[in-house]
């Protein structure tokens, strides 16, 4: 019986361990998808705010509305971690804010971008993809990029239609989105 249980445990370990390696890092020439507008399925810009596509799920519409609430906020290192509603946001604070507002994160507080490596599931989503690596995290939501910049100018959360390089990032998503 002990041999059987040992063999069973080893088999389970061998089957589940490869799943830990399914998450792959994007290659050097990788970039976010180019923005292409598709009626009903792609968000678009009106000024500095995003307009959700008509066919987007309710949570995606909530996420876009949440992003619009903070696009005017400046970049602030550590912003959005101590308080959900803050005067400035860094990358993980802004991503955490919109995901919580959309009901996609629960009460979990992600204090660093690196912690998003375990959020959701590996791979690209249909409506939402999280790009994450140590030191930075951003989203692509219904075709628009929601991103911050920690440069000296301190650009806080913003929506972008332009692609960006993403070598070294991992991609994550919520199943169904």
Map each language-model feature to its residues:
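Active-site nucleophilic cysteine motif
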Residues: 83-102
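...with weaker cross-activation on analogous glycine-rich loops/strands in unrelated enzymes
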Residues: 53-57, 61-64, 96, 100-177
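Intrinsically disordered, low-complexity
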Residues: 16-74, 152-177
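Bacterial N-terminal signal peptides
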Residues: 7-16
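Active-site nucleophile-His-acid catalytic modules used for acyl/amide transfer and hydrolysis
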Residues: 68-88
């Amino acid at each position: 019986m002990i041999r059987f249980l040992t063999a069973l445990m080893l088999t389970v370990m061998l089957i589940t361990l490869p799943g830990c390696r399914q998450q792959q890092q994007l290659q050097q020439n990788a970039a976010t998808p180019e923005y292409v507008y598709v009626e009903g399925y792609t968000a678009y810009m009106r000024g500095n705010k995003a307009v959700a596509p008509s066919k987007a799920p309710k949570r995606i519409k909530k996420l876009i509305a949440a992003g619009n609430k903070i696009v005017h906020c400046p970049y602030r290192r550590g912003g959005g971690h101590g308080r959900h509603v803050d005067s400035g946001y860094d990358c993980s604070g802004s991503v955490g804010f919109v995901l919580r507002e959309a009901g996609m994160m629960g009460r979990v507080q992600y204090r660093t971008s690196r912690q998003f490596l375990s959020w959701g599931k590996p791979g690209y989503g249909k409506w939402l993809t999280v790009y994450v690596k140590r030191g930075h995290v951003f989203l692509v939501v219904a075709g628009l990029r929601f991103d911050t910049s920690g440069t000296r100018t301190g650009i806080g959360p913003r929506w972008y239609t332009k692609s960006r390089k993403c070598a070294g990032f991992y991609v994550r998503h919520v199943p169904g989105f």
